[in-house]
């Protein structure tokens, strides 16, 4: 260890000689980067070959096979996913076709049911209308019979009323009562002329 003394230079002259000896042992030249010196090329080439050989061995035996497996797994996974997507798409298209077919069948059934219901309602309506018409015709015929009977009864009373009224008018005008037979024959003649 070198200790600087007071008044002495920090680096003794012997130290310069040692540095000079070190420089001479290193090739006697000052300066220059050792890897660029031609006398070191042989050892550097050997280490270069060893380093690249080890790197090549590690890359070819460890790293590249791993990368290859990873790429192959990714490729297989992508192919599997694409195949599964194709299957799902085919299933989806089949389901859509089945849905459309079922929808078409349901529409056809609904139209058939609606047609049957319309036909049934039309038949029921026709049957009800015919029944109602028959019922109304029967009531109308019965009413016409009653009207005819009432008319005949009323007309038979009209003759009697006409005979009584005519007799009363003749009595009021002439002052003496007319004979029943004369009044009845006059009323019958007037009724016969009116109905003809």
Swiss-Prot record:
Function comment: F(1)F(0) ATP synthase produces ATP from ADP in the presence of a proton or sodium gradient. F-type ATPases consist of two structural domains, F(1) containing the extramembraneous catalytic core and F(0) containing the membrane proton channel, linked together by a central stalk and a peripheral stalk. During catalysis, ATP synthesis in the catalytic domain of F(1) is coupled via a rotary mechanism of the central stalk subunits to proton translocation.
Subcellular location: Cell inner membrane
Membrane topology annotation: Single-pass membrane protein
CDD domains: ATP-synt_Fo_b
Record organism: Azorhizobium caulinodans (strain ATCC 43989 / DSM 5975 / JCM 20966 / LMG 6465 / NBRC 14845 / NCIMB 13405 / ORS 571)
InterPro entries per record: ATP_synth_b/b'su_bac/chlpt, ATP_synthase_B_chain
Keyword field contains Cell membrane: yes
This protein's UniProt keywords: ATP synthesis, Cell inner membrane, Cell membrane, CF(0), Hydrogen ion transport, Ion transport, Membrane, Transmembrane, Transmembrane helix, Transport
Subunit structure: F-type ATPases have 2 components, F(1) - the catalytic core - and F(0) - the membrane proton channel. F(1) has five subunits: alpha(3), beta(3), gamma(1), delta(1), epsilon(1). F(0) has three main subunits: a(1), b(2) and c(10-14). The alpha and beta chains form an alternating ring which encloses part of the gamma chain. F(1) is attached to F(0) by a central stalk formed by the gamma and epsilon chains, while a peripheral stalk is formed by the delta and b chains.
Family: Belongs to the ATPase B chain family.
PANTHER family noted in UniProt: ATP SYNTHASE SUBUNIT B (PTHR33445:SF1), ATP SYNTHASE SUBUNIT B', CHLOROPLASTIC (PTHR33445)
Spans through the membrane: 41-60
The protein, known as: ATP synthase subunit b 2
Superkingdom field: Bacteria
Region (Disordered): 1-33
GO cellular component, one term: proton-transporting ATP synthase complex
Biased composition (Low complexity): 1-18
Record-level Gene Ontology MF annotations: proton-transporting ATP synthase activity, rotational mechanism; proton-transporting ATPase activity, rotational mechanism
NCBIfam families reported in the protein's UniProt record: PRK09174.1
Keyword Protein biosynthesis: no
């Amino acid at each position: 260890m070198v200790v600087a003394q007071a008044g002495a230079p920090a680096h003794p002259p012997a130290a310069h000689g040692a540095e000079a000896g070190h420089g001479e042992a290193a090739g006697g030249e000052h300066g220059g980067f050792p890897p660029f010196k031609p006398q070191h090329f042989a050892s550097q080439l050997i280490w270069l070959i060893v380093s690249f050989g080890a790197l090549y061995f590690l890359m070819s035996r460890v790293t590249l096979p791993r990368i290859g497996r990873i790429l192959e797994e990714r490729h297989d996974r992508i192919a599997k996913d694409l195949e599964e997507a194709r299957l799902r798409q085919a299933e989806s298209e089949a389901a859509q076709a089945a849905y459309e077919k079922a929808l078409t069948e349901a529409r056809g059934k609904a139209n058939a049911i609606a047609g049957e219901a319309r036909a049934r309602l039309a038949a029921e309506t026709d049957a009800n209308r015919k029944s109602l018409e028959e019922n109304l015709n029967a009531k109308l015929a019965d009413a016409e019979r009653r009207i005819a009977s009432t008319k005949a009864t009323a007309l038979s009373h009209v003759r009697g009323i006409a005979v009584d009224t005519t007799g009363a008018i003749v009595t009021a005008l002439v002052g003496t009562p007319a004979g029943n037979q004369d009044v009845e024959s006059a009323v019958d003649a007037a009724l016969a002329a009116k109905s003809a």
